[in-house]
Amino acid sequence: MGRAIGIDLGTTNSCVAIQGKIIENKEGARTTPSVVAFTSSGERLIGAPAKRQATTNASNTFFATKRLIGRQYGDPEMKDLNVPYKVFAAKNGDAWIKTTDGKEYSPSQIGAFILQNLKEAAEAYLGEEVKDAVITVPAYFNDSQRQATKDAGKIAGLNVLRIVNEPTAAALAYGLDKKHGHTIVVYDLGGGTFDVSILEIGDGVFEVKATNGDTHLGGEDFDNAIVSYLLDEFKKSNGIGLKNDPMAMQRIKEAAEKAKIELSSAMETEINLPFITADANGPKHLNMKLTRAKLESLVNDLIERTMTPCKKALEDTGLSANQIGEVVLVGGMTRMPRVIEKVKEFFGKDPHRGVNPDEVVAIGAAIQAGIVQGDVRDVLLLDVTPLSLGIETLGGVFTPLIERNTTIPTKKSQVFSTAEDNQTAVTIKVHQGERKLAVDNKLLGQFSLEGIPPAPRGIPQIEVTFDIDANGIVHVSAKDKATGKEQKIRIQSSGGLSESEINRMIREAEEKAQEDEKRKKFVEVKNQADSLVHSTEKSLKEYGDKVSPEDKSAIENAVNELKEASKSDNIDDVDSIQQKITNLSQLSMKLGETIYKESQQQQGKESSAGSSTTNEEEKVVDSDYQDIDNKEENK
């Protein structure tokens, strides 16, 4: 069995680790922006290179796609989405994204591209192929979102050993060396989601007692609050709205994120965006100051929203805030001073800040990978399901079978009956949530059990069994106890990716990887061509008069041909460019021979001159020495 990695697939940034060590990416950074872009030439960019070109390619630069993963286009959260790229409803109702040239991608595919990039970084570090991984998800992710994340891993060519909750992973990294039992809270405010988990840890046992959260609350919302403020202020000052200008919006978003980060350490920052737009009177510039106090007033409601899940989690455990031993902060947004203050006010103690909030989840995932593979021993992890799971019963009532905060894996059965006389089939609708009516909860999927013998209503006995595995993914079965007929399914909602779609995306990912390798070779060959042209032109300038006119002309023609070929952006021209490099290299050999001879002759002259000088110096020294001796003798 090969070594397994731990991956934190984040909304804003992602991170990969192995055996408690963070692996740097190709750019040498410890975290990778969760950004994927497609250029006009068809090149796919991931991470920092994708983020750098976002201003000029906003419609084809996809960020924060974790907020779309496992979601239907009609979900309420989609209304607040503030992104410059096209989001549309796929055939199955899922939220997908589209490039300006019409190419369609599922959020799982975009996640897979990021996972592939992290996988390659790990392989470069380890010097071997990596197949197995543990991937983290927000604790409050529902079944559809967990399944979509697992699909992303599969598309990326990874065997997903386990899907683990982010706060639980953070607790593993924090508490692995803690021997004495105590209760901790993990407050995880990331780029797109918020989770809070309460755990009891000690002697290698990590038991989650309760978890709560909001899968649509994070740093992106803080950025959007600043963006809205800047847009309003600019419109007041200049009378111009910028919402419909993608390039201006991207510049403002980047400036907002930068200002937010700066105000974690400074009391005031200046946002300066020259030439943001223009009107009949000329160019307009966005220039304004933002104080920490103003930022806090803009995002105060968002910070307050994190307190409600904290209260619910405490209520579910029956604990009070003063019974919490430690509060561990996770996620980049927990660097904000006002967030730290609010957590301190609520729990009545200074939060623990001894872990890196950007890296601790990936480290915990790597530890979990070690546990699954048997490399890390004497550690027991007991996680919970974040949401109640049940079925729709008569009158549209939601009947839970497994309550929220039940330790997983778990299995629960309950017997139901028919609602009408002589009913020969029942449809089982599976929901997840906390509302009383089924329609108000998330419909995970439905299936039918047919062939029930006709009987008065209430007589048939249909046993419905729910099974939640260690990944938090749901499996359901229904059995007619009279006939023994059984129907088993792994929940797959009306949305979600089918097996054939996943296989198609795996093939596309493999093809794209081959294309990326081809493009990499193309760039390397073009760089080689540029270098050869430069060195040859320099040599021609210095030594062109030393070769025959015919040879000089042939070399100049070969240089021009290579220059022209190098202008191509078609990766299929790589062999043609390589051929012209070989041709120029062979022709340049005569020029190289001339340079070598010239160099040898020059060295010979210097050596001869040096030898003559040495002899003369020796004679002079001898003469002087003799004179001195004579003088000494005459004394």
Curated annotation (Swiss-Prot):
Composition bias, Basic and acidic residues: 535-552, 616-635
Annotated GO MF terms: ATP binding; ATP-dependent protein folding chaperone; unfolded protein binding
Modified-residue entries (Phosphothreonine), positions: 193
Induction: By stress conditions e.g. heat shock.
Region described as Disordered: spans on this chain: 533-552, 595-635
Amino acid composition bias (Low complexity), ranges on this chain: 597-612
PROSITE patterns, A to Z: HSP70_1, HSP70_2, HSP70_3
InterPro entries reported in the protein's UniProt record: ATPase_NBD, Chaperone_DnaK, Heat_shock_70_CS, HSP70_C_sf, HSP70_peptide-bd_sf, Hsp_70_fam
Keyword Glycoprotein among record annotations: no
Family: Belongs to the heat shock protein 70 family.
Function recorded in the entry: Acts as a chaperone.
The protein, known as: Chaperone protein DnaK
